[in-house]
Amino acid sequence: MNARKTYILKLYVAGNTPNSMRALNTLREILESEFKGVYALKVIDVLKSPQLAEEDKILATPTLSKILPPPVRRIIGDLSDREKVLIGLDLLYDELSDNEMFYSSDK
């Protein structure tokens, strides 16, 4: 992982439902293990702040948005699969390419 990058994420949830809490707990585990010290996470309860959900065109929860670094990416629904979350947010590719795990066959 490139420590110079800062990841800005927003997690939209609907109250303290089991699905919302599971999404938050899973995401925190991923962020603390993979991106410790280089991320900011804002949790937005759409029941308490519906205007924020409307501004960002959030139609379902949980929704996770990666704001920075670009491009903006979103995952809607189940966040329990670590690898799918990282791939969906385009974070796993960055992590692998920063470690030079992709090889070119253009030799």
Swiss-Prot record:
Keyword Nucleotidyltransferase: no
InterPro entries, sorted: Circ_KaiB, KaiB-like, KaiB_domain, Thioredoxin-like_sf
Tree of life domain: Bacteria
Swiss-Prot/TrEMBL keywords: Biological rhythms
Gene Ontology biological process terms in this record: circadian rhythm
Pfam families referenced in this protein's UniProt entry, alphabetically: KaiB (PF07689)
Domain notes: Has 2 forms, fold switches to a thioredoxin-like fold (KaiB(fs)) when bound to KaiC.
Family: Belongs to the KaiB family.
PANTHER family referenced in this protein's UniProt entry, alphabetically: CIRCADIAN CLOCK PROTEIN KAIB2, KAIB-LIKE PROTEIN 1
More about this protein: The kiaA gene has been eliminated from Prochlorococcus during genome streamlining. It has been suggested that the central oscillator in Prochlorococcus does not have to be as robust as in other cyanobacteria because the former live in specific niches of the Earth's oceans; they divide exactly once a day and at the same time. Thus gene loss and changes in kaiB function compared to other cyanobacteria, can occur.
Cited function: Component of the KaiBC clock protein complex, which constitutes the main circadian regulator in cyanobacteria; it may modify the ATPase activity of KaiC. May be a metamorphic protein which reversibly switches between an inactive tetrameric fold and a rare, thioredoxin-like monomeric fold (KaiB(fs)). KaiB(fs) binds phospho-KaiC, and perhaps clock output effectors.
Full protein name: Circadian clock oscillator protein KaiB
Encoding gene (name): kaiB
